């Protein structure tokens, strides 16, 4: 199944939903209609029983350049309009992602700048082409990160490295130390891997095959524990150990009654590949 607007393509195949940002002439910079479609597509994928994994990528040579700087020049009528524009606009994407228990993978095919980098780090995993480059970007145009970088980056790379990324906004060719959120330096893919911003870096020509091979591995797995694992990992960041272990014991009791658990045990005993059904 494929549905699309001019600015975002949505396709479902083999239990994998692909969201493709589609403004290649503008490096896939956001627009209002694109964000509307993005929020819709995430909700659609979450509630579609034929979707087990979501992949987000960009068309052309960029992943996403973030907000359209040319449009920023027009400004907002009031500060309140600007705040509400974020909350009711682009913030729908991280708020929707927070509620999704299906795995979401960013397939980073090129430059990811500003909110484009932010949108990549709020996905569960990131697989990047070896030519991909990253920058928080905001400080270069006198802004604070607007889509959640200050929330997600510290959880990925730690406070000091997050500040370095967000302070500098320059390209980084080699490891640096303390200023990331203040400088908006660009980071090459190998450094992004070293910092923990991405989990895998592959040659440009292999990016699509590598991403979908990983996505299919997850999509073919037992979906009940896969989604419970995602919930447990994210909830663990907000809970004390005893509360977390209480949740773990409850989830374990549930999955041990599932057909997929029984199939997994049977397949192990019979030395064959399991055939999970998601129940």
PLM features per residue range, with description:
Residues 1-59, 95, 175:
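Conserved CoA-thioester-binding segment of acyl-CoA-metabolizing enzymes
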Residues 24, 127-132, 188-189, 198-246, ...:
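C-terminal long alpha-helix characteristic of the crotonase
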Residues 168-183, 187:
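Thr-biased low-complexity repeat/linker tracts and other Thr-enriched repetitive architectures
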Residues 7, 58-96, 112, 140-142, ...:
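Glycine- (often His-adjacent) and acidic-residue-rich active-site loop
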Residues 1-6, 266-279:
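Terminal low-complexity tails and localization/encapsulation signals of metabolic enzymes
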Residues 90-100, 106-107, 113-167, 194-195, ...:
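CoA-thioester-processing core
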């Amino acid at each position: 199944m494929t549905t699309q607007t001019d600015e975002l393509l949505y396709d479902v195949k083999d239990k994998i939903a692909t969201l493709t940002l589609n403004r290649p002439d503008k490096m896939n910079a956001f627009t209002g209609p694109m964000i509307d479609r993005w929020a819709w597509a995430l909700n659609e994928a979450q509630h579609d029983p034929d979707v087990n994994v979501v992949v987000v990528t960009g068309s052309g040579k960029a992943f996403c350049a973030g907000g359209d700087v040319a449009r920023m020049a027009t400004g907002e009528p009031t500060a309140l309009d600007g705040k509400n524009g974020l909350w009711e606009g682009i913030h729908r994407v991280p708020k929707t992602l927070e509620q999704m228990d299906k795995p979401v993978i960013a397939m980073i095919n090129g430059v990811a700048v500003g909110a484009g980098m932010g949108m990549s780090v709020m996905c569960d995993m990131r697989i990047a082409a070896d030519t991909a480059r990253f920058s928080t970007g905001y400080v270069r145009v006198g802004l604070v990160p607007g889509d959640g970088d200050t929330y997600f980056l510290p959880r990925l790379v730690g406070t000091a490295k997050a500040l370095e990324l967000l302070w500098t906004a320059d390209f980084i060719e080699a490891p640096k130390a303390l200023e990331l959120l203040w400088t908006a330096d660009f980071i090459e893919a190998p450094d992004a891997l070293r910092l923990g911003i991405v989990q895998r870096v592959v040659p440009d020509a292999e990016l699509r095959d590598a991403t979908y091979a990983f996505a299919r591995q997850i999509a073919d797995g037992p979906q009940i524990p896969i989604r419970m694992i995602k919930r447990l990992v994210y909830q663990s960041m907000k809970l004390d150990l005893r509360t977390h272990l209480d949740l773990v014991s409850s989830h374990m009791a549930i999955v041990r009654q599932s057909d997929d658990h029984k199939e997994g045990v049977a397949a192990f005993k019979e030395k064959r590949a399991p055939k999970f059904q998601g129940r």
